[in-house]
Amino acid sequence: MRDETPEQPAPLRFGYTTGSCATATSLAAARLLLAGQADDAVEIVLPKGQRVMMRLEFCRATADGAEAGTIKDAGDDPDVTHGALIFARVALAAAPGVRFHAGPGVGTVTRAGLMLPVGEPAINPVPRQMMTTHLEALAAEHGYAGGFDVTIGVEGGEMLALKTMNPRLGIVGGLSILGTTGIVRPFSCSAYIASIHQGIDVARANGIAHIAACTGNASEDAMRAHYQLPDMALIEMGDFAGAVLKHLRRAPVARLSMCGGFGKLSKLAAGHLDLHSRHSSIDLPLLAQWAAEAGANDALQAAMRAANTSQEALKLAQADGVPLGDLVCAHALRVARDIVPPSVVIEMFAIDRQGRFVGVAR
């Protein structure tokens, strides 16, 4: 008899951050310089104490030091750097300590508000600490009293960076070297949420008092046209409305405009802070209830509950003169108001699929 037990999906694979890759390659290059040992794999210790072995593509001497490279494996996370070659070039220096430099494909910070000063290579604090810890331990092991100049690069990083928020954050010339745990967790979205927080921080540090958080390109275009806001004021929040609102609780601005498609805004209005379809759905009966409170008759309510999409429910309400878009924005505003400090002026905008405003609340 045929076994009809459904096949269990394989668990999603974890991967390693660019910070882990930079640590492994810088350690391998430095070991070649101090011990004459060219490895094809190297063990590193992650910030939480796990030991992992990372395979190297090369480890070789150069005219002024040594270099090593590894292929970034992000596991099953849809990471823009997955499969990229990340490399470190290390040179010994008389002065003690570790100094970091941006190689090809790694960006440089040009705006205030990030975790690094303007002019520094975009190598975040945790990866810097990881590399420093490993290199200092290696130096102690070999009785080396000097320092290290470490240059980190990403092959093709200049082009890959265009797919990230780095250009808007003022990180020019390439990618950032990231990571807080050393591990990439599949679909954790932590990097995206971090970029939202960074976008807000950069705006604040550069004197932007009014930011617009947008779910996508159409809503961003609508906000740009409506307010003539600079790119620095436009925050690509995607589905992560909660990431914006909760960060503003800690780092407020004077004014927040949130703009999204009507369906996305209806999820926020219902109290959902993650607007992705995996985590929230559109509540048509709730939309019908709100329409009823604005005077919708029984027939319209029934039609809205039976609608196939939120857009269909919106059109039905509009045809009957019920301002459903404004109602949804008003409820979304209440949700945001409960999270964001009262000093922040908030307004909500909903757009249709053509990018036209179909609702507003202030």
Swiss-Prot record:
Catalytic activity, per the record? Answer: Co-precorrin-5B + S-adenosyl-L-methionine = Co-precorrin-6A + S-adenosyl-L-homocysteine
Query: What molecular functions are annotated in GO for this chain?
Result: cobalt-precorrin-5B C1-methyltransferase activity
Q: Which GO terms describe its biological process?
A: anaerobic cobalamin biosynthetic process; methylation
Record's keyword annotation contains Methyltransferase: yes
Its pathway, per UniProt, is: Cofactor biosynthesis; adenosylcobalamin biosynthesis; cob(II)yrinate a,c-diamide from sirohydrochlorin (anaerobic route): step 6/10
* E.C. numbers: 2.1.1.195
Q: Which InterPro entries match?
A: CbiD, CbiD_sf
Q: What Pfam families does UniProt report for this protein, alphabetically?
A: CbiD (PF01888)
Q: What class of enzyme is it?
A: transferase
Keyword list, A-Z: Cobalamin biosynthesis, Methyltransferase, S-adenosyl-L-methionine, Transferase
Q: Which domain of life is it from?
A: Bacteria
Record family assignment: Belongs to the CbiD family.
Q: Which PANTHER family match?
A: COBALT-PRECORRIN-5B C(1)-METHYLTRANSFERASE
Protein name per Swiss-Prot or TrEMBL: Cobalt-precorrin-5B C(1)-methyltransferase
Q: Which organism is it from?
A: Burkholderia orbicola (strain MC0-3)
